[in-house]
Amino acid sequence: MQRTEQERIRRESLAALRAHGIEPYPAAEFTVTHRSKRLAAEFKDGMAVTLAGRIMSRRIMGKASFAEIQDSEGTFQLYLNRDELCPGEDKALYNTVFKKLLDRGDFIGISGETFTTQTGEQSVMVKELTVLSKSLKPLPAVKVDEDGNVHDAFADPELRYRMRYVDLVVNPDVKATFEARSKVMQTIRQSFDGAGWLEVDTPVLQAIPGGAAARPFVTHHNALDIPLYLRIANELYLKRLIVGGFEGVYEFSRNFRNEGMDRTHNPEFTVLELYVAYKDYHWMMQTTENLLSDICQAVHGGTKANLNGTEIDFAPPYRRVTMRDAILEHTGVDIDGKSEAELRAACEQVGIETDDSMGKGKLIDELFGEKCEHHYVQPTFIMDYPVEMSPLTKVHRDNPAYTERFELMINGTEVANAYSELNDPDDQRQRFEDQLKLSERGDDEAMFIDQDFLRALEYGMPPTSGIGIGIDRLVMMLTNQTSIQEVLFFPQMRPEVFDQGPDEKGLQALGVPEAWTPHLVGAGFDRPEALEGLSPGGLREKMNGYRKKNKLDIPALTLEEVETWLSARN
């Protein structure tokens, strides 16, 4: 990869630091007394403090300078006076190291004394300075004016997602989003642990990808010589644990689905799954709305959150609407008692394309997804799904054509899916067999039959309610994000294609002196192929001009030397 001029200069500074006896990447622990946020809160003049962080700006003014360092909590101002930092004869730490060899982006550690400037700014007078890490690539120079307007923003989505490490440094709002994500998960853990439920881990590699209707990723286990699947859900394993005697289990599950990518879908995502014995879906609705209210309180300090200009109120109770009523209200179609042919005709009548692989469940799902879903902005439980849509759900206690299932819709998006869990092993086997028939018709999202899970149910599972909550989508809503990529540290992207980098040895093989090699690279001639078609005189003139401009302490090139390089290449 060709180095920029700034990168070349930083590498020269790196070498100069070492020449001064300063290790730019020390191994020793550096102990701090404060971070920026705590220091600002506890600040008073005359405190002895030790801070560490990344240099974000410098204002050099001769014998005195200001700098700003950034740590995990924020930024803090430093004041460096040459004679305070270097009280003895040797002023190199200030005059050379700080002023010339350090750059924006470098990590330093400092010790000093707090004081307030004449303009009222909290600052630290630096008495000691330690280089902790030299940055070899310059950070984007994002600027914020007095009115809060951002200039030269690091805003390109592809660059931000590929280089999240840079995004986090220069865009504070991004860091706040992921801190909110952490609060969401902490709040859930506190609630569930307080209820006495057990956090567990279940397999990611599975012989049968059960628990959901989705297309799995397939891999191969060489030692066992069998196909394995990345999990699409952990539901069936958690139910096995309920069979085993745990009354409440939960897991933050990393799931994988080999399907499309858009603003709400990533092939790898996080779902919270909870299963509690002796409960039903009515209890789970109440538990869910109370949990989400607590989560919003933890993130925002209240039960309301702004999402694209719409105020979402997470305070319970949430509206409850049956699937039948939702479709009837928004399409005029009554799904009750309809055959597959009638549902197919109804879909086509309202402009939904169908194919022969779609059974009753898929047709109803399309009706709701295409025509109804977007109407539910405030938190709403869509409940009582047709039995064809819910192969793992207990039949409704009052109507066997429906199931005791709900999905939580917020801002037109599904956030949670929950059931009164099916615990009748014979009924479950029949549901799996119905799914197998759909698979044979070409539905690649139909569920597999998991014989071991059926065996587990035959040992007896108590009445149980379970829920899956999409953590990524929930965080999107709580942080006012419109893309799932904004709430994933490293969203899935096509692999980046890197160039091969500089070939200094290849240049030296042509006869380029070792002293000249990095400067050819810095000038853009980073590989032997880059010299093809160049005239000896033109290359000599360019490189000697480069030597003069950068005041390089190496002999000027002769025409004969350059001719030798090019003839060796050609």
Positions of the model-derived regions?
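Class II aminoacyl-tRNA synthetase catalytic cores and aaRS-like
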Residues: 1-500
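Compact, charge-rich alpha-helical regulatory domains located at protein termini
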Residues: 496-570
